[in-house]
UniProtKB/Swiss-Prot annotation:
Region (Disordered): 1-21, 354-376, 394-416, 434-455, 962-1061
Coiled-coil positions: none
InterPro entries found in the cross-reference section: SPHK1-interactor_AKAP_110
Chain positions with Phosphothreonine modification: 251, 363, 742
BP GO annotations: cortical actin cytoskeleton organization; positive regulation of establishment of endothelial barrier; protein localization; protein localization to endosome; renal water homeostasis
Identification of the protein by name: A-kinase anchor protein 11
Start-end of Basic and acidic residues biased regions: 442-455, 1002-1011
Residues that bear Phosphoserine: 434, 439-440, 595, 835
Keywords, in A-Z order: Peroxisome, Phosphoprotein
Native organism: Rattus norvegicus
Biased composition (Acidic residues): 1043-1056
Amino acid sequence: MQKMQCHLRRPLHSSSSFSSQAVMMTKPMQEHKKEYTAQQALFRPSGIVTSIPVPLAGSALLPYHVSSTLYQSKSLSSSEHNKANGGSPQEHIAMESSAEEVDCFKNTCLPSELSPCSQNDFKPTNGDIDMQSPSKLMSGSMIISNFSTAMVHTIVNETLESMTSFKATKPVDTNADYLTKTIKGKPVLSLCDQAAPQQNKASSKDMFAEHLSKSIIKHSLDKSKSVLPNIDKKPVSKEHMLVLGEESQLTLGETPKFLDFSDNSPQYCVPECKDSVGFGFSLEALPPCSMMTSQKSDLKGVMKDKVVTRHNLTNTAFEPLSFGQESSFRPSQTLSSAVLTCVDSLHVEDKQKIRDRNVIPDTPPSTPLVPSQTSSEWDIKKLTKQLKGELAKEFAPATPPSTPHNSSVGSLSENEQTTIEKEEFMLKLMRSLSEEVESSEGEEHPEMDVKSEHSGKKGQFADALATHIISLATEVAASHLDHEITQEFKVQNSHLTVPSQRSMLPALSHSDESIQTCSFASDMAAGVIAEAEKVANTRSCMLFGHERTICHVEGDRGKAEEKLDVEDIAHPREVETCVLSLPSCMPGLTYKYPSCESVTDEYAGHIIQVLKQEGGNSELIMDQYASRLAYRSVKSGVREAAKTVKVKCSLKLFPMHTSHVKTNKELLFSSKEHHQEVDKKRQRKKYGSHPCKYQTCDRTQDPCRNELSELYRFSASLASSITRDVKKQLTAPKVDLPKSSTDCCLFEKSECVDNRENVTGPEFSKSCQPLQNHGLCQNTSSLSGYSCGESAHTVEQYARKVVGDTLELSLGPAVFLNSETTTSPDRITYAEKLSPLINEACRYCDLKESHGCIRNSAQLFSKQGPCASAKPSSHSKLSSIRQKSRIFHLDVPQIHLNLDKRAVLAEKIVAEAIEKAERELSNTSLAADSGIGQDGISFAESLTTEIMTTAMTNAGHAVSSSKEVEDFQSTESLGSQQMNLSVGEDSTGSWSNLSFEDDHQDESSSFHHLSESSNGNSSSWSSLGLEGDLYENNLSFPTSDSDGPDDRESEQEDGAEGLQPSGKTLLIVNIDVEPGAVDPQLRVILQWLIPRRRKLENFIFSTLQRRSLSYFQSSYRREDGKWAMSCRL
């Protein structure tokens, strides 16, 4: 509930109608506070300031009904307090929520809610009022709720009718003359009745409202008389119209009576509302502010007389109300003013303490000499401060009261000193925030916009003025009915019949002053209600897209619509300041109307700013920054998810019927995938722009609306061209089009694009026109320019591929993998990368079962689709998306891979590359650590000998054990074994950088036992049959390879020398992951020695290996079955 209160926060002085409800309650304090909080937290939102929309708040309000006790007390005191309040200038403070309540009820009340209140419930019979018993009338709270709903609905309808029949820009004098003529000429008819033929349902609504309002008010008065028959009524007469004072101690038993209308003085009365020009309210209609109580009952005497004139209306609209004012009742029924004016728990606690300390029982509070500041800006600042204070208390570290100072810090360790400094700094920060909360004056925020503040003052003035208007109309209606009831038992009552309801009493005569006041009030009422309706419509269109219910207003609005459109053009930014869409990632204290999420984000930004200014610890700044970043990330994610949900819900609830969609549905009949594309783009079009006739709807849309609408237009034109080609080519002769022709029309922009408008047809000419300059239209019509025609199957397949690519572009490239992930430590293979892409692309075109040629063609088409033409686009967002998609398509290899047979090979290749990269990182420090240099030649020679011996032994074992395996597989395994060895050269030419892996424990893949058998200076050359003179020659290989033709010829001759007829021929093939991965000399020597050791005479090297082997084959000679190195290598 506290969270909801934060969202539903409104200025404190705009809750008068709810305050009157709270005043009339007879429940104890604690029980009332709970019920009041639950009720008013849902009733508070106006649809402008809060983040919860009005329809949701209204629907949530339905289960919460106030008990019958509240409604009985309200019905008892409705007309009494209306009479007592009069037209005093102080009553405007209780009226600022009327315009918002009207909007709230308009959004929440359905016509079906009016049905329980039929005219049969209150039907006069035999000229007397057949009143129902209080138990019957108040049997259920639902009936009372429907009563108030009907009254509000009636007020709004009649106001709109008056706006239709009255020109708001007429001068006051003209209106006064016209009003006088109308009253003299036709005293029975009213302008509302004249406007009735313009609206078909006006008369029925008037009939129902008149019976309902009269019966309710009459029942209230009769019941008050029956409950209190012995209490004297005190008529109070004043010098000016309907401005009445009351005693400070106003109880339920005291019912001040209205003017005695027998005086027939023209100064006392306001003209009857039904006969006035622009008053716009029914004589019997009881608005939601009819239960007002006196907001100045704390005065010790009778209030001074004031004249309600145009000047007073303008001036009193800005008079604030102090927090201490309240209506005093009996001691058992006294309520705190904090309950009446504040929902926020912080304000309740604060003001409750003040009232408990200052109020003396049975005495009214003292009148404040100077009205306290109660403007909306002040309340917002105070709320922000209190929220910050609570957050500061919440986040304050639990530190002891006595913090150690610098004197004791010296003996502590460095870590403890740092911790203490951090705690002291945070404690000072929190204390400063708390002191700022407790201060009475709030500092001005420089980020506030002057224009927005000005518009906020305008809204306050409009609220107060509209409440004045409704108050005057209510009092006139109540006084009229009161006069009728007093005359009821003397003369046979005929006032409640429909013809005589509009008759004017003699006492309600019209003075010039009252006529001018009513004319001015009518002008202002039209503007106020139009402004409120405009704001409500704008917010509804922006958040929910209720096009049919909100944007297209029922009935003929006439001149009010024109005035509204003019105001939209003249003041384009005022509505946007009211409809407060939270800005994204704006630092600082910039929110005028704070909510929970804005205060949280704002608090983190403020903490960071203070930390930087005061030189705080960098760790604290980073912590606060990280928390704000995480919060914003979560908020943005939730916002994106909410957008998606809104689009889906709006599509289900309100299907859009536009010319583009209708035309697409008529044309796209040949391919199911076209309908999928249109549906997707229809959702984005619907979210992007609503068919609202108010310009403010387009002005307050999401910034991505233009991009989405352009994407929709592009997809519509593309779908139209594809459909036209399909329809035309379905009847064409089935001759296959050459692939070169298809590629030509996809790669090049032909002349048909320039004549796009004529080719596409009148339906899509408008959508294609904005995109001709950008080159986004697909050139599918150029296929028909060739003489051979085109097959229908080819066109349909192309259409499916384009649609699939368009859907991929719409959903974004987030599902696709990046090409850089191939070298990640997770060892993502090409097979793993290709499989999700195939499934993703084929999911939209229903081709999962065929991954062969269809997938290949899909890649071809999708590469040349909208993604290939993204560079001319003017929008950077679309360009970036399409560029990513283009890169993705280029990354997919254009070959067929048998994933079942080649997955193992790909896995090994990637694994070797990763292992090799890891080894190279450690090789740089190996030379320095090992100490191998000019003095370590013997160690290098012995180590090389052991490597050769172990390699030949292991490889020979592998070859002999895999005689049954294919030659290619064995060669592949041998090649992968040797790639594990990485050899480098230092400046002296000796082998110093050697690394070998110990991960594999099988004897055919590593040299794990090499280190055990090597002692650093001994060697086992005798095992190879090498002569001792080899010791005299340093075993070193040159780095350069000879590329001459002589070496190649000798290589071929020597290779042919050793070839003899044998059972099998071994083909040695090396696969290099990247150039220079393995020393080619060492690899060729080992691969040449292995088959010789195993007596395999027939072995063939690849072309690339022959060059590396040429220097070695020319330097050996075979003598008596022994190996001898006859010359230096």
